[in-house]
């Protein structure tokens, strides 16, 4: 199969992966409206072409939390990453490290912190949920710090799991789910050999290390369902600061008021995110929410964005809308499932090339030169009408 874009990796991953795993990453919440709008809204952002600008000295390098990045991209935290390729977190981290960008390890990774961190040169980032078991949270923070993790990504948009209807149909949950998963594994031999047999143990390493026993998929579902904490509040940031003194990024911001609160409570960064359309269906796409948030807090806090990014043009669009950097999630997981570390490395090369084309043809020689001036102005506005926030009159 010819691979020329992230969409090719998605098609390849669908053939390789058992359906329960493919649809777990590919699907969203409820009717998946927000999942679709994430991609569609971003694709509607029109770039402003500029020519004859002498673009021979173009650079994608940037700095974030005192870390030098080869381009404004980090790999997002993705749960169960190690089920998509043999020791998947290790392979993805190696690809990010070689490219000179951060890798973020999920709380619910297959490979534990202690397995991934020693395999790469640059410090990785660590993602944490707010859970009822504060002992686990403290344990995870202490282990992340001991392993040299540089930045904490604190996910706040999951006080309760979203309703993901695809999971019941695909075998991730629902009647006879375990039996259906075994059958799917048996009928997908490439995955069964690479991951099913040779990628063991298939437990959640960070949780197993704390509980002192293996955690299989059923344990994962049950433990998380019992531990998500709806009492989460801004005060939890103060508690986390008792155990974490490095940069802290709040992931799951969609409203300017929440962004201002993040500044007020001492966060170092935010991620404008709707969890990839996997939590509350019907909320704004990240592309549509980002401009107002940037207007509210740009310069006061680092702004990252995710959800809907599929190529290098999308990275440039997000930065033009107000982000300092982006997190890449689904796109890299498709590549990982297709070709492991080499797939992720190739995807990052593709994104880099696409960014260079977009920057060359919009006249931006550096990341700092990408702004709303890089977008086509319509009707006297700096943003396309399709992305203008709804007013009460519009909603009516």
From Swiss-Prot:
Q: Does the keyword Cell inner membrane apply?
A: yes
InterPro entries, A to Z = Aldolase_TIM, Alpha-hydoxy_acid_DH_FMN, FMN-dep_DH, FMN_HAD, FMN_hydac_DH_AS, LldD
| Localisation per UniProt entry | Cell inner membrane
Q: Cellular component per GO?
A: plasma membrane
The active site of this protein is located at: 275 (proton acceptor)
* Topology with respect to the bilayer: Peripheral membrane protein
Tell me which stretches of the chain form a coiled coil: none
EC main class here is oxidoreductase
SUPFAM superfamilies xref list: FMN-linked oxidoreductases
Looking at the record's lineage, which domain of life comes first?
Answer: Bacteria
Name the record gives this protein: L-lactate dehydrogenase
Q: Which gene encodes it?
A: lldD
């Amino acid at each position: 199969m010819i691979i020329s874009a992230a969409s090719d990796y998605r098609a390849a991953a669908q053939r390789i992966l058992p359906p329960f795993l493919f649809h777990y990453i590919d699907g969203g919440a409820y009717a998946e409206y927000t999942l679709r709008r994430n991609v569609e809204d971003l694709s509607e952002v029109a770039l402003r072409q500029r020519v004859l600008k002498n673009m021979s000295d173009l650079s994608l390098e940037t700095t974030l939390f005192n870390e030098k990045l080869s381009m404004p991209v980090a790999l997002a935290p993705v749960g169960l990453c190690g089920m998509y390729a043999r020791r998947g977190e290790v392979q993805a981290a190696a690809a990010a490290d070689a490219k000179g960008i951060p890798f973020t390890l999920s709380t619910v990774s297959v490979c534990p912190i202690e397995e991934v961190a020693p395999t790469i040169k640059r410090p990785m980032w660590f993602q944490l949920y707010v859970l009822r078991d504060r002992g686990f949270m403290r344990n995870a923070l202490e282990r992340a710090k001991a392993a040299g993790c540089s930045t904490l990504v604190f996910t706040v948009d999951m006080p309760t799991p979203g309703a993901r209807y695809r999971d019941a149909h695909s075998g991730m949950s629902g009647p006879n789910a375990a039996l259906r998963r075994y059958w799917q594994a048996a009928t997908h031999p490439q995955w069964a050999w690479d991951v099913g047999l040779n990628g063991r143990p298939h437990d959640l390493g960070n949780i197993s290390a704390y509980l002192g026993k293996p955690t299989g998929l059923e344990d994962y579902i049950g433990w998380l369902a019992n531990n998500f904490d709806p009492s989460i509040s801004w005060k939890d940031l103060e508690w986390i600061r008792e155990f974490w003194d490095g940069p802290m990024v709040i992931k799951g911001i969609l409203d300017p008021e929440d962004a201002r609160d993040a500044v007020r409570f001492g966060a170092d960064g935010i991620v404008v995110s709707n969890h990839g359309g996997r939590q509350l269906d019907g909320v704004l796409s990240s592309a549509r929410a980002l401009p107002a948030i940037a207007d509210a807090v740009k310069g006061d806090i680092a702004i990252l964005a995710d959800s809907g990014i599929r190529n290098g043009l999308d990275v440039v669009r997000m930065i033009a809308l107000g982000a300092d950097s982006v997190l890449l999630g689904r796109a890299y997981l498709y590549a990982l499932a297709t070709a492991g570390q080499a797939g992720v490395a190739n995807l990052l090369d593709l994104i880099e090339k696409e960014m260079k084309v977009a920057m060359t043809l919009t006249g931006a020689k550096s990341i700092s030169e990408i702004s709303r001036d890089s977008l086509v102005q319509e009707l006297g506005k700096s943003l396309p009408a399709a992305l203008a926030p709804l007013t009460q009159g519009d909603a009516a």
